[in-house]
Curated annotation (Swiss-Prot):
Renumbered ranges of Cx9Cx9RCx2HK repeats: 306-331, 361-386, 428-453, 475-500
Lineage per the UniProt record: Eukaryota, Viridiplantae, Streptophyta, Embryophyta, Tracheophyta
InterPro entries, alphabetized: Effector_transcript
Keyword annotations: Cytoplasm, DNA-binding, Nucleus, Repeat, Transcription, Transcription regulation
Protein name, UniProt field: Protein EFFECTOR OF TRANSCRIPTION 1
């Protein structure tokens, strides 16, 4: 932010800064820096006196102040060079001026009347097209006459309605600002004076018309809509705004509110931010993949096919219309669009069904029905199937019945097999030494696993094995009443827990 102030050193500048910050909209740090710079120069400030001040702020940055006869110009530079390069864009700065009475000596005055005016100022030296702001405040002021001429240019605009005798009043030594103190005091005219009872205090009195500062600032500078910043109070900070790109706009368009500019800039920023997300979305376009290898759409041909999922589960391979993604039949449809007439019910098991399946034994019996007996406490199986796996009976079947059961499971549309059992899903048909069938899967094109590939299958022996294994499923101990114990043996043994170590005919 660029601030230009003109004031005399005879005023208690620290108290002036606090009062100025209270009634206007400057930040405390910058006003305190002005007060420090003014209080260090105890000599009277004339236009021919100028100095270049440099100091470090609390944030670690550097501030440079240009002091020309009470005309203080200061800017704050950032700490790092990278941040400084970012801020080198063309910007509009706020010019704030305070006018004292030039006809009196600054050291002899205890009361200083001034006015604050705001206007945009450009870094290139170009100022607002108003008559009041046609002078660059950075020009070198050689003497007091040039400084008074600078004030005269500002005074023309203020008393434009009565400005017929402006030059004559200046030649006669009349006070440029004090002349308006009694006759036609304009809005925003303030007076600072010392309170002799309290030397450290400064009194502020409004001598102008009781009009809001917001309306006065609007009338003085129409090319910058800063009056909207005063809605929340006078303690707002005026920040630099980026220069408008269109230089040939009319004065009416320049008087638009800053809120509209913020809305347009926010909309442009949102549009620029949403563009990468749209590009990412277009790159990650989902491709339909079917279970059959023939229906898989190749990535190279995805742009030349419609790709809409049909009712039978396949994808539409029709060439889309030129300039579109879909064909004429599926115009405007999504990839996973399903017609509302077809409703696929979702078969989700209820809580009751889940509880029933959890509280049963679950062993698959030879007739392919699950055992629904309640398991023993703290176990998964019932008393009859203790220690058995779910598919234990499946391995006790002969190969023909086993193949038949597998084919029946494949023919059922409701069951979904996760593994491809065509060719490689058959188990080995060989029998192990303990009489049980081999549980290894046979490779494709053979009926034996790698261990039993040289052995031949004896169907007679398999039937004997079946009868033997069927008799080995139960304990088989003959009870006193002539019946046979049908309890399942302990894992790794031939007898149950009750008849452990007993013979059949004992």
């Amino acid at each position: 932010m660029l601030v230009v102030l003109q004031i005399h050193s005879s005023i208690n500048v620290k108290v002036f800064a606090s009062r100025l910050r209270k009634h206007f909209f400057f930040t405390r740090r910058k006003i305190t820096r002005i007060a420090t710079c003014l209080s260090s120069s105890r000599c009277p400030l004339y236009p021919s006196h100028w100095n270049l001040c440099r100091w470090n702020n609390k944030q670690g940055g550097t501030e440079i102040g240009l002091l020309i006869g009470g005309l203080i110009v200061f800017r704050q530079t950032l700490k790092s060079d990278q941040e400084t390069k970012r801020e080198q864009k063309k910007r509009d700065w706020i010019l704030v001026t305070a006018f004292p009475s030039p006809s009196c000596s600054p050291c002899s005055r205890e009361t200083t009347t001034f006015e604050l005016i705001m206007t945009p100022f450009f870094q290139s030296g170009r100022v607002s097209p108003d008559l009041c702001f046609c002078v660059n405040p950075f020009q070198k002021l050689q003497n007091s006459q040039d400084f008074c001429g600078l004030l005269l240019n500002f005074s023309r605009f203020r008393s434009k309605a009565k400005g017929a005798n402006e030059k004559e009043n200046f030649r006669e030594g009349k006070d440029l600002v004090g002349r308006n103190r009694v006759q036609g005091a304009f809005q925003g005219l303030y007076e600072l004076s010392h309170d002799h009872g309290r030397k450290d205090d400064v009194l502020v009195a409004n001598l102008g018309q009781p009009e809001s500062i917001r309306s006065r600032l609007r009338s003085y500078s129409r090319s910058f809509a800063h009056h909207d910043l005063l809605k929340q109070g006078l303690s707002q900070t005026i920040l630099p705004t980026t220069q408008n790109k269109s230089d040939n706009q009319t004065e009416e368009k320049k008087s638009d509110s800053e809120e509209e500019r913020e809305v347009s800039s926010d909309a442009a920023e949102k549009e620029s931010n949403s563009l990468p997300s749209i590009l990412r979305l277009s790159r990650s376009r989902p491709q339909p993949v079917s279970e059959k290898h023939d229906d898989i759409v190749d990535e190279s041909d995805s742009a030349s096919a419609c790709g809409v999922l049909l009712e039978d589960g396949t994808t539409c391979t029709t060439t889309p219309v030129k300039g579109r993604k879909r064909c004429t039949e599926h115009k405007g449809k999504r990839l996973s669009r399903v017609s509302p007439g077809i409703h696929i019910p979702c078969e989700v098991p209820t809580v009751r069904e889940c509880e029933e399946t959890e509280n049963i034994c679950g062993v698959i019996l030879p007739d392919m029905i699950r055992c629904r007996s309640k398991p023993v406490s703290r176990r998964k199986r019932c008393e009859d199937h203790k220690g058995m796996r779910v598919n234990a009976f499946f391995f006790l079947l002969n190969p023909t019945e086993r193949d038949k059961a597998v084919n029946e499971d494949k023919s059922k549309p409701e069951t979904s097999t996760g593994m491809n059992q065509e060719g490689s899903g058959l188990l080995c048909e060989a029998t192990t030494k303990n009489g049980l069938p081999c549980t290894r899967s046979a490779p494709e094109g053979s009926k034996r696993c790698w261990q039993h590939k040289d052995k031949t299958l004896n169907h007679g022996s398999s039937e004997n094995v079946q009868s033997a294994t069927a008799s080995q499923v139960i304990c088989g101990f003959k009870l006193y009443n002539g019946s046979v114990c049908e309890k399942s043996p302990v894992k790794g043994r031939k007898r149950c827990e009750e008849h452990k170590g007993m013979r059949i005919t004992s």
